Amino acid sequence: MSNTITDKNQIKSEEKDVSSLRSLSEGITSDNDNNPKLKRRLNSIDFVKGLAIILIILSHLSDAWLNSEWRFLFGIGTAFLDIFGPSLFILLSALSVVFSIKKKKETIPEKVIRNKILFRGIAIMIIGAFFNLSIPHNPPYDVFPFNIFPLTLWGWNILFFMGFTQIASYFILKLNINVRIVIGVIIILIGPILREIIFYEIDTHPVFLWLNFFITSPVPQLPFLPWISICFISTTFGEYLFKMMNQGTEDALIRLYKVFFISGILFITSGIIIGFRLHTTSTIDINLYETIDWLTIANNQNFLQFQFPGMPEFFIRSTISNIFYLLGWALLIISISIYYIDIKGKKGIFNRMLIFYGKVSLSLFLIMFLTGYLFTEGFPPWFFVITYFGVVGLLGFLMYVWTIYFKGIGTPEWIMGKIGAIAHKKNNVEKN
């Protein structure tokens, strides 16, 4: 009897140690809630994150490791794989915030929920800000005062924006659902136009220069306009996800799958219809739309018998059609994963591996940048493929060892969990 009690205590202790590793997706995937209806896990969310992170690693390493003769594959591949990129993670981040708020608001004070989200978002933004320090500023931000600390910390890279998304989603959720949809669509439609107007006026008045600095930033991977629109749209889907999960039935999951699937198809179709025209670097400004450079890279080859005449606008990140297109694919990918992972219960070795990768995706994302420096433009494609799978497997193994045997101490997921615990502890101290 005493051995059984000891084993149970040990299991509880281990579960407590590793629970912080799920902090970024805790709202959707946590089992530790007193409401029996919420005990069902959506493993598909972690599956999507895991699939996305290994494809992001593929894109990043192909850019860094493929030799000059084969680098055109990066330009072609990344244009198609961008559907697994920032937009998917931003949507998942917003969904997790919504679910976390809705699930905990009846048992945890509003102040604690708010502080957890704020601290977590700020922590991710700080990590992203340090990445900005390693990126040199180009004109017009290579001069004083933009080229000195702390302004060099500012830039909308994926981590910086993801942290901001956590915070923004909390406040956006307070708006009426219909208002959110309207605002989100309006931002998608006028955001890129407004950003272009501000950019082309930066030489006329310092106000436009500073507006462009904050809206587009010296690191315009995900400029505030129009990307903030995803927060308004995704919180709407987050509330529906919570509603269906709260019912806790297979029929509810099927309805969730259908809504996400149909919505995804509609968004994708809208993006393609709006953005079917082709662009080149002569028809669209590379300073505003950096990913048009993928076309230049794709055409820099001697193997194919033709040159791509242009890049469809819906492939060019941050255009109106691109936001619709990427948002649609994010919803479609999530819906398909819900169907196969949660409804059909497909849990093979590969799926379980991706689910684990999803739980440690932030750590893998950060480590990815270090592996990129191991080699520089030296691999033909066949050797790159072997090396890529080796690196992905090794990173997964190392993260598994780190998580199981070292409790994930020091990982970003562990840090996020500790930050949330601090916020909760602070509230308890104030109560006493």
Language-model features, listed with the residues they occupy:
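Alpha-helical transmembrane segments and their immediate juxtamembrane cytosolic regions
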Residues: 2-432
